[in-house]
Amino acid sequence: KINPIIIAVDGLSASGKGTIGKIIANYLGYEYLDTGLLYRAVAFKFITSKSAISIDKAIDIAKKIRLKDLDNPALRLEDCGNLASKLAESEKLRQELIIFQRNFPNKKKGAVLDGRDIGSVIFPNAKIKFFIVADLEVRAKRRNEEYKKIGIEHTITNIEKKLKERDKRDKTRKVSPLLCVSDAI
């Protein structure tokens, strides 16, 4: 049995988790998973189907998600991110997506996962845990660059406002709030 090495990368939205996680994974030859894309994929299904949002339907969607579903650039859109953050407050949906996340490293020598609760909930025994922080202004500029790449115009002020709202929601949700665990770097 392969016992994969798990590296957890947690942090705020647009803090650089994905960039850092991908660099580490590429350097080590490990697989990489942006776990936020799982929630965004569920949100995207609701947005594109224009169906009423329910947790039962979200769980049904989550059960059908495959890795290839996470390659869609539309998952990076603001609407997907905001709805994903709200859906992530559901304990039932989180439990379903935890299954996907915990199975991801199977049959691999190692995996890097980034998100909000990788080191605290998904893999509390991860070999290495990082918690990434960046100033709000830097994060807003990073997010603005992401938006520009997909043809979306925003003001830095508006992006900062949205990031603050997202930070508050992520840090204060009852289930798996964003926090820096004591053994994170």
Task: Please annotate each region the language model reported.
Residues K1-P4:
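Phosphate-binding P-loop
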Residues I7-V9:
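Hydrophobic anchor at the beta1->P-loop junction of P-loop NTPases
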Residues A14:
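Walker A (P-loop) phosphate-binding loop of P-loop NTPases
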Residues G18:
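Walker A/P-loop
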Residues L37-G110, D117-S120, E137-K141, E145-K149, ...:
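ATP-dependent small-molecule kinase phosphotransfer cores
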Residues A111, K127-F131, A184-I185:
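Short, well-ordered beta-strand core segments
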